[in-house]
Amino acid sequence: MAKLRVAYEYTEAEDKSIRLGLFLIISGVVSLFIFGFCWLSPALQDLQATEANCTVLSVQQIGEVFECTFTCGADCRGTSQYPCVQVYVNNSESNSRALLHSDEHQLLTNPKCSYIPPCKRENQKNLESVMNWQQYWKDEIGSQPFTCYFNQHQRPDDVLLHRTHDEIVLLHCFLWPLVTFVVGVLIVVLTICAKSLAVKAEAMKKRKFS
């Protein structure tokens, strides 16, 4: 029995292989929960928005300014200001007036405005960026219809110009944790099976020559 027990002991390489497999299994499960919490839920909410056709009703500054944070080096940060511009549109899904936003991130950052410029140290540069964006929607887009995204249940008074997430995000949320988990399981199973076959082969060899 002692000899049989020794035969079933794993070598250092086999032990490391099993440990690696278990680590990958745990990593796959943990990453699935992390991706599900950080990416999957926001992506599902974003994908619930319905594609619609929007036309511009009005483009105007409302006379309010908001602060943004700029960086000027590794340990250098500061705040500057930008004016608030609002673009109201009519969307084909609800046939109602709604405030346009660049994307979900911009909506959550400043739900009152349609655009947040790249934050610069000088307020004048922020103003110029907003003015250029405002002029684009007045002159280039005008009354031309464009694609927007509308969520009747969550935000009936807002529409998005771009989706932050798409179906690819959902694929990655499931694919990589699943691949990690499956690879871990395969490593553990193949290591155990290989050891079991080696022990059986050794036992048969001993019986043959005994």
UniProtKB/Swiss-Prot annotation:
Effect of residue 210 to A: Suppresses the effect of okadaic acid and increases activation time constant
Keywords: Glycoprotein, Ion channel, Ion transport, Membrane, Phosphoprotein, Transmembrane, Transmembrane helix, Transport
Segment forming the signal sequence: none
Localization per Swiss-Prot or TrEMBL: Membrane
Effect of residue 11 to D: Suppresses its effect on KCNMA1 channel activation and on deactivation kinetics
Gene Ontology, cellular component aspect: plasma membrane; synapse; voltage-gated potassium channel complex
TM spans (from-to): 20-40, 168-188
Example GO BP: potassium ion transport
Residue intervals annotated with topology Extracellular: 41-167
Protein's UniProt keywords contain Nucleotide-binding: no
Cytoplasmic side stretches: 1-19, 189-210
Known tissue expression: Predominantly expressed in brain. In brain, it is expressed in the cerebellum, cerebral cortex, medulla, spinal cord, occipital pole, frontal lobe, temporal lobe, putamen, amygdala, caudate nucleus, corpus callosum, hippocampus, substantia nigra and thalamus. Weakly or not expressed in other tissues.
Topology with respect to the bilayer: Multi-pass membrane protein
Stored Pfam families: CaKB
Domain text: Resistance to charybdotoxin (CTX) toxin is mediated by the extracellular domain.
UniProt similarity note: Belongs to the KCNMB (TC 8.A.14.1) family. KCNMB4 subfamily.
Subunit structure: Interacts with KCNMA1 tetramer. There are probably 4 molecules of KCMNB4 per KCNMA1 tetramer. Interacts with FMR1 (via N-terminus).
Function of the molecule: Regulatory subunit of the calcium activated potassium KCNMA1 (maxiK) channel. Modulates the calcium sensitivity and gating kinetics of KCNMA1, thereby contributing to KCNMA1 channel diversity. Decreases the gating kinetics and calcium sensitivity of the KCNMA1 channel, but with fast deactivation kinetics. May decrease KCNMA1 channel openings at low calcium concentrations but increases channel openings at high calcium concentrations. Makes KCNMA1 channel resistant to 100 nM charybdotoxin (CTX) toxin concentrations.
Protein name: Calcium-activated potassium channel subunit beta-4
Gene behind this protein: KCNMB4
